């Protein structure tokens, strides 16, 4: 995931009215470890300012002055800025955008159980999140829905805990080197597993949509 070096500067509430005044190309969906559930990513109220795309800070004066300038001293004191590897307004480690701007599976770096979620919204994540995508040569062999169906199953939860490392209090670390050791099987039940997993994903997304609608009505009632 991304290391900002100062979340207060780069991570903002998506309801902040000032966001309407800046170019949308600098705003990315942003989640942390806690936002990942089984199968889907829960709604996050945060956006990331991807300031590495700023070519000239003077041209983006409102963005810089409003969100970044208040933390300039702290941003300048980051190691990479002191060594002139980064401009003061850039993310500490912004990573390559293509890693985030594609369909992928995201998962937390530590958890008590397997939590693998499909992302279709080009979501960016913090350093406590890992992700992977299906290589082109395997896209006709496996679907994302099939994979999360396997990985979130009780069988694969037990499987991972055999090879994974417990950090304490039944919390396991999910470092990529361990995840990549998991064997993925495919047999005559593939279509059924995929179909059931697609159903779970669909129902989970519907649940979030209904929950959001409910909260909207309640907020409107409280505002009267």
Which residues fall in each region the model found?
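Non-catalytic DNA-recognition/assembly elements of restriction-modification systems
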Residues: 184-224
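Polybasic, glycine- and aromatic-enriched phosphate-binding surface used to engage nucleic acids
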Residues: 1-192
